[in-house]
Amino acid sequence: MKKLFRFALCAFALLAVLTLRAQSEAPNFPLPVRPDTLRILGVGNSFTDDGMMYLPELLEAAGIRNVVLGRLYYPGCSLRQHCEFDAADAPKYTYYKSERNRWTTVSEAATLREAVGDERWDVLVVQQSSAYSGIYTSYHPWLERLIERVRFYCPNAGACVAWQMTWAYGSGSDHGAFPKYDNDPQQMYAAVVDVARRVTEECGIETVIPTGTAIQNL
C-alpha cells in the first residue's frame, strides 16, 4: 500500500516541479513562475491525505527544499460537507504542514478558514469524496461554493485552484458506495474521468492532478 501511495504521489510531485520551473499556458489563475517558495494546500479527505503524505520525501530526494505543503483532512469529507463545516466555522479538520520537507501537526481541531488563511498559498487543491466522485449532481453548487470560500480566506488573491481526480475502488472492494457504480472499477473510473472533465471545465479549473489515472494504470 505504501508503494502504491508513493506512485500516486508522483502526480503531486510533478505539480510542484512544473510550477517551480515552467509557466502554465492557460490557468484559472497563473501558477507562479520560479517562485522563491511554492506553497500548496490540499483540502480533502483520506485521498488528499494519502496523495500528499510522502511528497516531502520525494521533494527532498529531488533536492527541492523551497516548498511549503499543507493538508487539511477530514475522513470521507465531500464537497457539500466542506461547505457545511465552513458555514458553521466548525473545527472539524486535522491540519498538517510541511515547511522543511517534514510534516508536523498544526492542529487537530482546525477550521477551513484557519488553514486556508495560514499561508499565502499559491495552489489550493480540492477534491470530491470518492463515493460521489463519479456522480455529477453531487458537485453543484458545492464545488463553486468551496472555491469561493477558499479564495475568500486565502491571503493570496491570485492563488490557483487545482483539482485532484481520485481513483476508482479496486475489484472486490466492500466500500458501501461501490454499488453506485455496479461494483465495477472500470465503470467507476470512466465516471470519475468524465465528471472531472465536465466540472473542471465549468468551474474554470485547468490544473488537474490525475492521481486516479496513475492508480488505474498500475
Where do the model's predicted regions map?
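Alpha-helical cap/lid subdomain in secreted, periplasmic
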Residues: A109-L218
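N-terminal secretory targeting modules
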Residues: M1-R71, D174
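A broadly tuned preference for mixed-charge, low-complexity surface segments
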Residues: N28, G70, F85-T105, S173-M188, ...
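Short low-complexity stretches enriched in small and charged residues
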Residues: E25-N28, R80, W163
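Conserved SGNH/GDSL esterase-like catalytic core that processes O-acyl groups on lipids
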Residues: D49-H140
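Residue-level detector of flexible, active-site-proximal loop/helix-junction positions
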Residues: F47, Y73-G76, A168, I215
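Homeobox/homeodomain signature
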Residues: L4, A8-C10, T37, V106, ...
